[in-house]
Amino acid sequence: MKKLFKYLFAVLLISLSGKAQTNDDSSYDYVKAFKTDFYSNTSNNVRSASGKPGAQYWQNKADYLIDVRLDTLSDIISGKEIITYTNNSPDELDFLWLQLDQNAFKNDSKGSAVIPIRGSRAGTGGEKLDGGFKISAVQLISGKGSKKSVSNADYEVYGTRMKINLPKTLRANGGEIKIKIDFSFLSPYYGSDRMGIVETKNGKIYSIAQFHPRMCVYDDLNGWNTLPYIGQGEFYLEYGDFNINITAPSDHIVLCSGELLNPLETYTLDQLNRWAQADASDSTVMIRTPEEINDPSSRPDGKKTITWRYRMENTRDIAWASSSAFIVDAARINLPSGKSSRAISAYPIESYGNNAWERSTEYTKASVEHYSERWYEYPYSTAINIASSVAGIEYPAVSFCSYKSRGGRLWGVTDHEFGHNWFPMIVGSNERLYGWMDEGF
């Protein structure tokens, strides 16, 4: 009887289960459940269903002229910039949005409120500092020649964003305006594992990024993309041309995204000859040796500071590093078209030897050559790996990787970060919203 009861109970359960599964009144919609929210339009005049730009594709442009100065006594970076913003969209713009990512490191920022003091990659790692941008001037420049006018901007700051209300609508389809901003900030030692400072035997290494106000992206999907930066989530930026002047102490070597325009002013004659050797070599060539770090003759004579001038075209971002402690080496990168680029590594004496950073240029060269064959030819004149306080982060043509890494770990992080030059740096995806697109790839 007991067995019969168990049998009948099992039959009843199976019957009820079957009815539940065939219930036509279910509100579940599998199409809605699995529909993507990152590409809702399968095809239009701007974006085709194949992923290629449509016949009326547009994107706005932001060109930057930047002058910055590094004060190694205070760790303050001060500067000014002129942004030339071109509105290629079909929409007139009454206001502009900019990103102030350094504001994430203010004590009263949203990031400081929501990021754990310890145990998180984001934030300042518990460091308390008077961080964030100090904006001393924002001006609008319109017109050219005799019609040029300069006026103080009407702007508001909302956390890590700045809104500029325009006195006159910026016209669609090519309207242009210039924005001049004077700024400064105190660099954190640990800036969300994306920038920072590390102290070494022979001086501090400054790994500097998100160091100037940058335009938010205005696109056809979301209009202004103004999601705040709280330390987590990376970046979405307009493309443009960058010209930057970086003034640092004369015993420093400064490496930056792009092409160095004044090598004769920044390197010695011996070092210039070594650069020429590196450009013709598939093996690593020392530019500044470990023995030369504290040798005054390894730096140009006669000045307390040197201004390094760099230029990079058609990029969404730049980053730079500065230190008196750098050993520097380089080698040629061979590209599929027959052109070449330059692999460069800069690291302190603590990172030299025992299968460590003396192999970084070898790893950088191998990574860029591989991805150039596999995906798309590397478009930049240099690929620079900086030994840093940062565990691993990518910027166009520059990576910051831990100065403690060595062996397979150094190879892995170097290869990963330089792979990011294709995704998202060349592709230009929205990392703030869809970080999985480049990290997951």
Write out the residue ranges for each language-model feature.
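Catalytic Zn2+-binding segment of zinc metalloproteases
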Residues: 421-434
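Bacterial Sec-dependent N-terminal signal peptides
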Residues: 1-24
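Short, hydrophobic/aromatic-enriched beta-strand segments in well-ordered soluble domains
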Residues: 81-83, 87, 100-102, 175-189, ...
